[in-house]
């Protein structure tokens, strides 16, 4: 790996700053071999996957939907929850099977989900007969790629030799880590978005744009990544030759535009994706304070059952963490990272109520690098994180794996 550039005076203080400016590698384009740290991270990744599979097995036997059940059901059934059904329906039947669509009263609003993960699922299913196993395999492979990319990004930001391993550890033990092991789109998105960010810091702009475009096929968050990449490009371009890759930055918007065109051709609605979000998940625009108020009432005013109320409490906490992260990034002048996280918060924090913000934290790599810097500086902070995150990650995993709403 390239040697880190000399740090500025501010960075020579005993307390390393939050996300110091990353190094830029204009040299080699060939991927380096796996280091000892990479192998350690992959071992940790395998162990955390095994722990989640054990949890899933135990959940099906200890917490069945029917307390009198004598059969735990199919071994992969705990992973067939919630959004997985939408991805499966799109992959197996398409977006508008047999002429059905949003004009039907019982429509499931599946067009709210971008096509990247369902397309990958359909492709893998050609060689893996089980749809669920195919989805888990995608997330398993993508998650491994993602943690290796995260290790390399952490090395750019932090000088500590253990920075990459620590950052990956914090992500894999995070409260919502279960969603990296299920048939959801988070792992696949990270497997594309993190290498795109890494390529941008190496000024490999065509590669960064292609990877970001692929990430946009998976989640709308790819557009937030594209905005961060564009800002990073503007802030780092110095010479005329640096500006030549500028047209590539339009590429990540193409998948979203093509998807909107496809939906318009089938529904006559250019905003079909947004309207599906509104119908299925109450994502009509509301002022941020209105969304906070509604979420607070849902969490604490006893208007919902305790399980849903707890998850809304988690939504509020995740919003506070996100706002604090953006404030820190702005304070440290990490503008592209602040734009990426800020756009995510704006999209999730301006609907009727908060939904999926805890899950979105998985995609905020600046958060995990920031926490890694703090834990490397303070062993007590690391101990506190592990002790607090462990029960939360267990609760979220059990909640999801037993079929309850987990955000």
Predicted regions and their residues:
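Membrane-interface alpha helices of multi-pass inner-membrane proteins
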Residues: 172, 179, 193-198, 206-233, ...
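Signature aromatic-anchored transmembrane alpha helix within multi-pass, membrane-resident enzymes
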Residues: 250-253, 377-407
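Short hydrophobic/aromatic helix or loop-helix immediately within or flanking a transmembrane segment
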Residues: 81-97, 104-128, 288-297
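Transmembrane-helix signature of polytopic, membrane-embedded enzymes
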Residues: 130-134, 150-173, 335-339
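Short acidic/glycine- and proline-prone juxtamembrane loop motifs at membrane-interface regions
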Residues: 182-188, 357
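Loop-to-helix entry region of an early transmembrane alpha helix in multi-pass inner-membrane enzymes
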Residues: 105-106, 111, 115, 119, ...
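Membrane-lumen/periplasm interface segments of specific transmembrane helices
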Residues: 51-65, 226-322, 336-341
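Transmembrane-helix motifs of polytopic, lipid-linked glycan transferases
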Residues: 123, 137-158, 324-325
């Amino acid at each position: 790996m390239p040697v880190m550039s000399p740090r500025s005076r501010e960075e020579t203080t005993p307390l390393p700053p939050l996300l110091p400016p990353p190094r830029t590698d204009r040299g080699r384009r060939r991927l380096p071999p796996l280091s000892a740290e990479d192998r350690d991270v992959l071992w940790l990744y395998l162990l955390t996957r095994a722990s989640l599979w054990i949890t899933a097995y135990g959940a099906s036997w200890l917490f069945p939907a029917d307390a009198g059940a004598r059969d735990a059901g199919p071994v992969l059934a705990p992973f067939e929850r919630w959004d997985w059904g939408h991805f499966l329906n799109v992959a197996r039947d398409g977006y508008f099977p047999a002429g059905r669509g949003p004009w039907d009263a019982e429509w499931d609003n599946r067009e709210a989900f971008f096509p990247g993960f369902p397309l990958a699922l359909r492709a893998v299913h050609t060689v893996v007969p089980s749809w669920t196993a195919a989805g888990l395999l995608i997330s398993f492979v993508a998650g491994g790629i993602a943690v290796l990319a995260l290790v390399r990004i952490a090395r750019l930001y932090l000088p500590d030799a253990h920075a990459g391993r620590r950052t990956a550890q914090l992500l894999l033990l995070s409260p919502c880590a279960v969603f990296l092991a299920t048939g959801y789109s988070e792992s696949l998105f990270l497997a594309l978005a993190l290498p795109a960010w890494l390529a941008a810091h190496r000024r490999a702009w065509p590669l960064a744009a292609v990877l970001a475009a692929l990430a946009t096929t998976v989640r709308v968050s790819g557009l937030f990544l594209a905005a961060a990449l564009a800002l990073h490009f503007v802030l780092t371009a110095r010479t005329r030759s640096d500006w030549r890759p500028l047209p590539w930055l339009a590429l990540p918007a193409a998948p979203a535009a093509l998807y909107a065109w496809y939906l318009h051709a089938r529904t006559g609605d250019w905003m079909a994706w947004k309207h599906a979000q509104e119908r299925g998940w109450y994502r009509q625009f509301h002022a941020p304070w209105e969304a906070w108020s509604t979420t607070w009432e849902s969490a604490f005013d006893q208007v919902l059952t305790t399980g849903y109320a707890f998850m809304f409490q988690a939504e509020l906490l995740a919003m506070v963490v996100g706002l604090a992260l953006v404030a820190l990034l702005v304070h440290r002048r990490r503008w592209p990272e602040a734009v990426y996280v800020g756009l995510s918060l704006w999209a999730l924090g301006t609907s009727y109520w908060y939904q999926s913000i805890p899950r979105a934290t998985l995609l905020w790599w600046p958060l995990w690098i920031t926490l890694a810097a703090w834990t490397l500086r303070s062993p007590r902070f690391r101990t506190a994180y592990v002790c607090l995150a462990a029960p939360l990650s267990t609760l979220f995993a059990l909640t999801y794996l037993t079929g309850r709403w987990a955000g």
